[in-house]
A protein has these predicted regions:
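Formylglycine-dependent sulfatase
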Residues: 1-183
Length: 183
């Protein structure tokens, strides 16, 4: 399945033609964006008193020129824009945020935190994201109420085509499959 429609289905429990995301989201496709009027699984947990956290790739919204560091600009200069910043009012109950729209430089990822600050960790994205999730679970920095239950959703980007690229994986993993047909 395509990235955006699949994530829309995971969030809403709906088929892509009902979630608002029939195609991968980019700035040329205003018809493909998570519906504002739908309850997502995160809304249900949040309304039941859970702390809700999202980590990693979301890719469920039509990109708009809303870069927190460059007001009125897209978060990337590529045309069409694929990556997107998700403002608080579009996070469907997630009160802890460490995510991005879509970005395929897995060894040089970026993320926006709950307050819209951009982070550029220069670490392979699955390793970085899993570390952030563990930190959240341990409640390092008191990022959640320890008396409340919590719900975590993680959107890992890799593996992602092209599969014959060291940009998509760590070298030791690449070497395991370098002589096998993956295409």
């Amino acid at each position: 399945p395509l990235s955006s429609p699949h994530r829309g289905s995971l969030l809403t429990g709906m088929y892509p033609n009902k979630s608002g995301i029939p195609l991968n989201c980019n700035s040329d496709r205003p018809i493909s964006s998570l519906r504002e009027d739908v309850d997502c699984v995160s809304d249900v947990f949040s309304n039941a008193g859970y702390d809700c956290a999202y980590f990693g790739k979301l890719h469920a919204d039509f990109p708009t020129p809303n870069d927190p560091q460059r007001p009125g600009k897209y978060v990337e200069d590529r045309v069409p824009a694929w990556d997107a910043y998700t403002p608080k009012d579009r996070r469907h109950g997630f009160n802890y945020w460490y995510a991005y729209g879509t970005f395929d430089e897995h060894k040089n990822p970026h993320y926006w935190d709950t307050d819209g600050k951009r982070h550029d960790p220069r670490e392979w994205s699955p390793l970085h994201e899993s570390g952030k999730v563990v930190s959240y679970l341990k409640n390092e920095g008191n990022v959640r109420d320890p008396k409340k239950p919590f719900f975590i959703m993680v959107g890992m980007n890799p593996p992602h085509s092209p599969y014959r690229s060291l940009d998509d994986c760590m070298e030791q993993d690449f070497n395991l499959y370098k002589d096998r047909p993956l295409d």
